[in-house]
C-alpha cells in the first residue's frame, strides 16, 4: 500500500496516536505523519503510507491554513487555553481598525520565539520537558512566513464582554499560532492566548478532502482503498521532468545525471523525475560537481 491519506485529526489525540491507529487499520507499519498537531487542535493531517513516507518532508514543507480563536485580556503558561493563567488585564474597547493595524504589522516575514511548551529541541531535550521541570531555557528564534491574516467574525470592536475574535491564518511551515496570538496581544497592549484552533488546509489537502479514522476503518473493512491519493499529489508544487526509458533505468540505480538534461528546470532546488506518469525519483544539483545532478531520493523500487 502506497499513497497519501488526508486525515482529519480529531481533538484529544496526538499525531502519534493517529499513526499508531492507522498502522492497525491499514495493516502496515510504514505510516508517517507530516508535521505534529497539538492534541487539543483538530484539522488536516496528511499521512504518508508505504513509499510515500519518503515524501513526508516535502508535504510538511508546504503552506498551511488555520482558523484560530484568539482571546485578549489573559495570557497562559502554554499560550493556549490548556495552560495556567499568567496575567490578566481588563479590556478597554479595541476598534476593528486597531486590530487590523496589528494584523497588517504581523503579515510577511516575522520572527517568533517558540513557546516553552513545544517540541522544539534545545541541547537534545524538548522544550516542554524543561517547562514541566520548571526550567526556563533560552529558545532559538525562527523566521516564519505569514501570507495573510483575515478576521472572520465581522468588524465589531473587542471589549471586556467580547474579548475573542476569529482569524484565518495562511502561513509557511514552522509557524506557532499560539505565539502569533501572543504577538497580536502585545501589539494591542494586552495579554492574549489562542483559545481554539483548527487546521483547514495542509499543503494541497483541504478539510473537505479529509476522512476521519472511523471512516478509513469503515472503508478498509469494505476493501475500498479509493481514499489513497497517489504519491504525485505530495510533490504538486515541485518542478517536474519527464524522462525516457534509458534515463529511467539509470535513475533506478541512483546514477548521477548531466546538468544538460535539466535545462528547463536547472535553477530549481530539486526536481521530480516522472516516467510514464509515475514519480520515480527526486534529483537536486550536485553540491560539488556543477555539471551534474544527484539523487536526493529514489522513490520507485527496482523490479527484481
UniProtKB/Swiss-Prot annotation:
Responsible for synthesis of pseudouridine from uracil-55 in the psi GC loop of transfer RNAs. One of its GO terms (biological process) is mRNA pseudouridine synthesis. This is tRNA pseudouridine synthase B. It is an enzyme of class 5 (isomerase). It comes from Listeria innocua serovar 6a (strain ATCC BAA-680 / CLIP 11262). InterPro entries: PsdUridine_synth_cat_dom_sf, PsdUridine_synth_N, tRNA_psdUridine_synth_TruB, TruB_C. Coiled coil: none annotated. It comes from the Bacteria. The keyword Phosphoprotein does not apply. Pfam families: TruB_C_2, TruB_N. GO terms for molecular function: RNA binding; tRNA pseudouridine(55) synthase activity. The gene is truB. Gene3D superfamilies: Pseudouridine synthase. The keyword tRNA processing applies. Keywords: Isomerase, tRNA processing. The active site is at 38 (nucleophile). It catalyses: uridine(55) in tRNA = pseudouridine(55) in tRNA. Belongs to the pseudouridine synthase TruB family. Type 1 subfamily. Its EC number is 5.4.99.25.
